[in-house]
A protein has these predicted regions:
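All-alpha RGS (Regulator of G-protein Signaling) helical domain and cognate RGS-like helical scaffolds
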Residues: 1-156
Length: 156
């Protein structure tokens, strides 16, 4: 076990639960970027591929983290329900921003639940998702990772 992610007795359960939720968000993001790749305008295809690769990398790291925290990583679902139908390049961009908001929310929860290196890693992932969301949307939000909470639970 990597001592950098070893939880304290009081935070271990919360950190594991939040890491599992972040892992689930990364699984969903990978699926979503598959849909995005099929609809995105060619001018933004490279950006979508890079984001997809970053989500796969984070997913793999979270899989290891969940194990290090003593859990069994949850597998991805066979398919995910999208928040809206993706018919065009504009829809693909909107989905990408939505995905990044959701991922940022999951990492925000992990930042609150974890400590030490795991908290720093979660903060880095939150920041990266917020930057990607701002690039897709064309504008940032005041409190990345809290978007859906600020909108009263509305996520799309």
């Amino acid at each position: 076990m990597n001592p950098a992610v070893k939880p304290s007795p009081s935070s271990g359960g919360r950190a594991l639960e939040a890491a599992q939720a972040a892992l689930a968000a990364e699984h969903a993001a990978a699926y979503g970027y598959g849909v995005i790749g099929a609809r995105i305008d060619p001018a933004r295809a490279t950006e979508a591929r890079e984001a997809y690769g970053q989500h796969l990398s984070r997913r793999d790291r979270l899989t290891r983290t969940v194990r290090e925290l003593g859990g069994a990583p949850r597998p991805s679902e066979a398919a995910y329900t999208l928040p809206f139908e993706v018919r065009s390049g504009d829809d693909a961009v909107r989905l990408a921003a939505d995905i990044e908001d959701r991922v940022a929310g999951a990492y925000s929860d992990l930042v609150r639940a974890a400590d030490g290196q795991l908290r720093r890693d979660a903060a880095d992932a939150l920041s990266a998702a917020a930057v990607r969301a701002a690039r897709w949307r064309g504008v940032g939000v005041a409190f990345p990772g809290l978007t859906e909470r600020a909108e009263g639970g509305r996520t799309s």
